[in-house]
Swiss-Prot record:
Iminosuccinate binds at residues 81, 99, 170-172, 187, 255-257, 272. The keyword Metal-binding applies. It catalyses: iminosuccinate + dihydroxyacetone phosphate = quinolinate + phosphate + 2 H2O + H(+). This is Quinolinate synthase. Keywords: 4Fe-4S, Cytoplasm, Iron, Iron-sulfur, Metal-binding, Pyridine nucleotide biosynthesis, Transferase. It is found in: Cytoplasm. Binds 1 [4Fe-4S] cluster per subunit. Catalyzes the condensation of iminoaspartate with dihydroxyacetone phosphate to form quinolinate. Pathway: Cofactor biosynthesis; NAD(+) biosynthesis; quinolinate from iminoaspartate: step 1/1. Its EC number is 2.5.1.72.
Amino acid sequence: MTTLNLRKDAAPAPAFVSAAARFGVIEKPDLAFTPAVARETEHLYEKVKDFIPAFEWAAYAPYVHAINRLKKERNAVILAHNYQTPDIFHCVADIVGDSLQLARDATKVDAEIIIQCGVHFMAETSKLLNPEKTVLIPDARAGCSLSESITGADVRLLKERYPGVPVVTYVNTSADVKAETDICCTSSNVLAVVESLESDTVLCIPDEYLAMNVARETNKKILTWKGHCEVHERFTAAELLAYKEANPGIEIVGHPECHPDVIAVCDFSGSTSGMINYVKDKRPQRVLLVTECSMASNIQAEVKGVDFVKPCNLCPHMKRITLPKIFDSLLTMTEEVLVDPAIADRARLAVERMVNLKQ
């Protein structure tokens, strides 16, 4: 029970001070493509030259150069999801990975400021795990169809309908939903999370296909919710079979946010990091990644000799994050991510249970 202090002399809550006021605004530097900028970014261009023509690099390089300088000046770190474009992933990010990796690494950063290059729920997760740090997202409109498919009120109704059944919630959700959750999961650890619970029945929400895929790997009864990723739900088994017929010997690597019929056609399925590790370890001659198409470009820069067939399904939300917006974040300190204190502690607990789960 919470006891409210109603004394007239109670100290008022401290006034909110914006990140811009706390850290100050930096004047916009020159973004000319000078010989010095070309020279200092040359090693980074080597990583992305297969995706960015030399004449276009003249527009990218000044932002890359300025961002990497501003990070040091601001004591900031950039966390980037595997779906970010190669210029962000390879040229300005300090930490890259899937949702689980980013959540874990967010707890280890020493920097005062976190710039989250991903969608909004990822930035919220970083804030939950780092309540004392300043977390910025370059574009607060970077949402997620899965996150928008369910609310905290929906979860409360599910708990009323299935009393005593533990709730496993995908991290692709808002803090409001996480606050109603027993434990979070990602696509890389969902089976381990489900198996860690003593109950024979588990609510696995909101991604219906992820839940259906994990149901095939466990003896527990899995209850689902009809949320879907707008990128992965577009893939079909017929489409992948057509690729196989047209490309004999091709290996298909899928993401468990796809329909189970799609996963059944794949040679391997796993989280984005699992997919990356599979390609790096197996080095297939030709491979098709059944996921957001920027990831194939990001791996291709690191894995030579592998032919990537790219069915290009783009995430419009991830693509809201751009170099100019990252640059503006570091200059103006806007789009700060805050979590309502009324739900933050409960949401944090669900994420921490996942992060601390023994694998």
